[in-house]
Amino acid sequence: MGSGWVPWVVALLVNLTRLDSSMTQGTDSPEDFVIQAKADCYFTNGTEKVQFVVRFIFNLEEYVRFDSDVGMFVALTKLGQPDAEQWNSRLDLLERSRQAVDGVCRHNYRLGAPFTVGRKVQPEVTVYPERTPLLHQHNLLHCSVTGFYPGDIKIKWFLNGQEERAGVMSTGPIRNGDWTFQTVVMLEMTPELGHVYTCLVDHSSLLSPVSVEWRAQSEYSWRKMLSGIAAFLLGLIFLLVGIVIQLRAQKGYVRTQMSGNEVSRAVLLPQSC
């Protein structure tokens, strides 16, 4: 809250804690009670329209409210009528409350905007099929978009340059808990040879939309790619095994040399005697 606003709210609360006749309505004062003041700023289209509201609550019941749209204190219960009348009679208090729209709400908005409403994080986009893709067989293509902020985002699917609207499903934006979002947009497909699927992502953090392609390949191409991956992994395993064997062989050679020296000494000693 802005400077100059907190003191008068505190003063009002101190005044309320007296629980005078206007609050107790002639009854005995309760032993335990809670008085609260809650202030809220409501923004529409940035700071184009701002509403400042202060709620005064006695034992969980709101009884007096200041609304900048109304411009005065309003009693919500009989308990609040004397206080509303008293506060509305103080022109300095009314003026300070009305000025809070600029002095509190718009002021704090400018301070917090760079790391709240102005914060932007670019998304990471990945496209992958749900199952091993085979031509002419139904499958589901996933467009995974992660780590973006704010949550408003547009994601579209294209097949050979034409937008696909049918068979599109989305999880919607999901909060990650770290001020970022993630979402997955899925497309039902039956891939044909030569088909090019494109996931187009448009977000306020991007200078231009990001597109990621996925191309349908023949079963032979997939088998060839998988065979290449398997051959690479197998070669890597053989390489590691060879390195381990070589290291062990070098250690064995050193031990053999030491054993040979010991044997030589054992043979020479009797001859010297």
Curated annotation (Swiss-Prot):
Residues 123-213 form the Ig-like C1-type domain. One of its GO terms (molecular function) is MHC class II protein complex binding. Residues 246-273 are cytoplasmic. Important modulator in the HLA class II restricted antigen presentation pathway by interaction with the HLA-DM molecule in B-cells. Modifies peptide exchange activity of HLA-DM. Changing L234F: In allele DOB*01:04. This is HLA class II histocompatibility antigen, DO beta chain. Residues 27-120 are annotated as: Beta-1. Belongs to the MHC class II family. GO terms for biological process: adaptive immune response; antigen processing and presentation of exogenous peptide antigen via MHC class II; negative regulation of antigen processing and presentation of peptide antigen via MHC class II; peptide antigen assembly with MHC class II protein complex; positive regulation of immune response; positive regulation of T cell activation. Residues 121-214 are annotated as: Beta-2. The keyword Transmembrane applies. The keyword rRNA-binding does not apply. Pfam families: C1-set, MHC_II_beta. Residues 1-26 form the signal peptide. Glycans are attached at N45. It is found in: Endosome membrane; Lysosome membrane. The chain crosses the membrane at residues 225-245. Residues 27-224 are extracellular. Keywords: Adaptive immunity, Disulfide bond, Endosome, Glycoprotein, Immunity, Lysosome, Membrane, MHC II, Signal, Transmembrane, Transmembrane helix. Residues 215-224 are annotated as: Connecting peptide.
